[in-house]
Curated annotation (Swiss-Prot):
Family recorded in the similarity comment: Belongs to the bacterial ribosomal protein bL19 family.
Encoding gene per record: rplS
Role according to the record: This protein is located at the 30S-50S ribosomal subunit interface and may play a role in the structure and function of the aminoacyl-tRNA binding site.
The protein's name in its UniProt record: Large ribosomal subunit protein bL19
One family name in Pfam for this protein: Ribosomal_L19
Transmembrane stretches, start-end: none
A Gene Ontology molecular function term of the record: structural constituent of ribosome
Organism the protein comes from: Rhizobium johnstonii (strain DSM 114642 / LMG 32736 / 3841) (Rhizobium leguminosarum bv. viciae)
Amino acid sequence: MNIIQQLEAEQAAKIEAKRTLPEFSPGDTVRVNVKVTEGTRTRVQAYEGVCIARSGGGLQENFTVRKISYGEGVERVFPIYSPMIESVDVVRRGKVRRAKLYYLRDRRGKSARIVEDTGVRARKLNDAERAAIAEEKARIEAEKVAAAQALAAEKAAADAAEAKAAAEAAAAAAEPAAE
């Protein structure tokens, strides 16, 4: 392995540590959550369509997603390791016999449909993804609960300190009156 491949592998591992992408192939319907910056505000926009191609390799790997928007075909190419991609969800598995589905560009309506894959591989991948998503949601929920508890404890400590300060101030105000 030469130096460039080694550096690319390290970068890919670093990006995969932050977010993991599910296993998907051409023919699968995917929902890509993309970060969109409008002025100073950044939001996440979902782009859902059929993956018609995967190309490249290593850090330069990308995939093409096609959808029909208002009767017009729209294709978008996403680099797999782009920081603008927040997540990719597989909506359904497609059963195709080609690696590149460019023939869908010429088709409309029912002829452009892709049969859903209900085989063992698809079920296994879907079950694994559902388990991973459920685990991720549970982890996020646990973090939220821990943060809420820490915030409540911090607020209670601040309220107790405030009450103590008020009691000391009242005691100090009562002392000169007693003299």
